């Protein structure tokens, strides 16, 4: 258990440092410094120590064993770079909806996904990996349609033109508040937005 705990500590710290470096590259200094600090809390860290594999998130193992992941529920409610954080109900209807992520957290989500692929793929990592992971992911059904379209565009840009081009685009267009979907002529697919129950 101690060996797993130490390896988990090294993995999450390495991940944080990669995200920090990427966030700093686009000017997100505070977010770079505070990224994923909740992973060091006992609620999240103990799960990592117990289920650590080094090839994927320990939350997957906890979910398979318990039917849910307490660590993930704790994490997503405290970290705004996860699209799952951005769910609330509409005033009047009280129907839960997926909200569009603010630009700074969309950018941090991109950095988080890049770093995760770099950590888990190691020397085999390519700039296509985050885009391919998104395309094959089954856990994005509750993402806001505009957020999904923006994320897809940015990770596709990474796959086609590389990190330098993507980071420059984030600095010049995303973090300035520009509507990148209008800029690029992208129409979000609202048919993928999920129905939520009433509050």
Give residue spans per PLM region.
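Metal-dependent phosphohydrolase cores
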Residues: 1-199
């Amino acid at each position: 258990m101690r060996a797993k705990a130490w390896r988990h500590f090294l993995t999450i710290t390495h991940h944080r440092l990669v995200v920090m470096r990427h966030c700093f590259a686009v000017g997100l200094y505070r977010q770079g410094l505070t990224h994923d600090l909740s992973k060091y809390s006992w609620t999240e860290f103990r799960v990592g120590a117990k289920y650590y594999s080094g090839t994927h998130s320990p939350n997957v193992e906890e979910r398979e064993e318990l039917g849910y992941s307490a660590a993930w529920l704790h994490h997503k409610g405290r970290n705004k770079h996860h699209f799952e954080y951005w769910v609330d109900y509409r005033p009047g209807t009280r129907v839960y909806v997926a909200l569009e992520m603010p630009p700074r957290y969309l950018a941090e989500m991109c950095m988080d996904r890049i770093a995760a692929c770099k950590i888990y793929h190691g020397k085999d990592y390519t700039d296509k990996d985050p885009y391919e992971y998104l395309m094959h992911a089954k856990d994005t059904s509750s993402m806001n349609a505009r957020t999904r379209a923006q994320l897809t565009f940015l990770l596709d840009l990474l796959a086609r033109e590389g990190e330098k081009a993507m980071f420059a685009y984030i600095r010049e267009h995303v973090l300035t508040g520009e509507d990148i979907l209008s800029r690029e002529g992208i129409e979000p697919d609202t048919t993928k937005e999920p129905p939520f129950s009433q509050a």
